[in-house]
Amino acid sequence: SSDTIMCKGKTGAKILQKCWPFKSKYEREYLDTTDNLVRGMFKGLGIRNTYATLSAFYQKGKFRFFETGFRLSGEMSYNYYEHLTGINYMDSMIRYAMGDPDAADYKEKESATSVSMVLNFFLTDGVIGRIKGIDELSFYKAVCKINTYIKEGDTVKNATNVFKKGLMVTLIANSQDDLYKTVAFVNTHLDIEDTAGNS
């Protein structure tokens, strides 16, 4: 489970999901009040061995779902899920698709000892001049994965209500304090500049 932290903006501003911290601060309440209903829904649909996401607003003690997805998700959760739980659901689904009836190796994992966060870095219009800090981040212990969606020389033109994503950095740490320090390190060392030198 995760929460979504949005960048601050006025009503009608472009949508920027800055990060997804794991696990959600509402996880215990979700497990106690709602999880059995969601599981019952999927079982009732006859769905087996799949990956699904549900997005919800938490309002006045209730989870109000507004989206369900069956793709592998934009945050690429397979990059951190195995580190956190020991479960590689990609391997399980591949084995199941190839006919292995015993491929469902999922276990109940209500909590993990590590903490995780996915940081998104969005781009404004312009031409990418330089991407700084990738090497420094790649050697930092708590940086699990760096997904790069642009390269120097690319032209960025935001034509929708969502800015183009330039980078996504997945972090896994042993404690909240280590996670906060890693976020600070990433924000200090990582930068994307346009050809005019603007950050």
Language model features by range: what are they?
Residues 48-60, 105, 199:
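A short glycine-rich, hydrophobically flanked beta-strand micro-motif that places a catalytic Asp/Glu
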Residues 1-47, 51, 58, 69-97, ...:
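ATP-dependent carboxylate/phosphate-activation module, predominantly the ATP-grasp catalytic core
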Residues 94-199:
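Peripheral (often C-terminal) accessory segments that flank ATP-dependent C-N-forming ligase machineries
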Residues 55, 59, 85, 110-111, ...:
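Flexible domain-boundary/linker segments
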Residues 64-67:
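Protein kinase-like catalytic core scaffold
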